[in-house]
């Protein structure tokens, strides 16, 4: 799908020339260009026209959440029929874990996640991995912060099709593998419920429910439902259900990671013991062993991001995956400089 720019205005003044020059520069492979203009001169509208002409997935970087939200609103109005997404930090509050050796005090990590922003982040990654070109993601420095492996995220996408033979219980297990949680009493975002042959999924990246109805071992209908009124909004012949969390892994990766972590734990504990640091060795062993038990039983643990390179299969010292890895090789970056 191509970008469809909708506006009551037409480029005027210096805008047509700027649009033409920027478009030509991108098409000719110019690595960097600068658009100058005073406040209120229509730079955002000019860039929107360039995006329409180039027709590639675009990352727009702003220096804080507030201005990113403003740009998101503006581009959303210019491209209402395209995928305009918002990706910033989803923490309302964050206190990292800490240890004070002098008093043997351990301070646990404490945080509060904004569920609405979490939904928008998942919508952004889902749009990028959908294969469509008409995607604009407005982001902040969060786009270079660590996140899950895009391959693992994509491998956990569930594709369903009306008339397809699929055992309902197999479908439910796949939802759990994609980190959706069954809750037949209170349906919240990222949950699903089962009533007979009907499965309602509150998609983690949407405001609506997806209803999948089975007839024996066959998918009979796929519908989008308003979660409050229960009104059917749309029907589909096929649908892709994206995971409920950005940090995905496979069972194979999980088992491999646990073995590697335990091997490294043995080496580090032995190293501490050789140095006479028996307390540190004991503390490290207890913490990591407990984390591995939690991962085996629940699939996650507090501070699991500390083990990310093992789950991603990365070598020591290599950077983690970030939002940039979810973009295709050929995409456009626009940086909005601060005043």
Q: Language-model segments: what does each one mean?
A:
Residues 1-339:
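ASCE RecA-like P-loop NTPase motor cores
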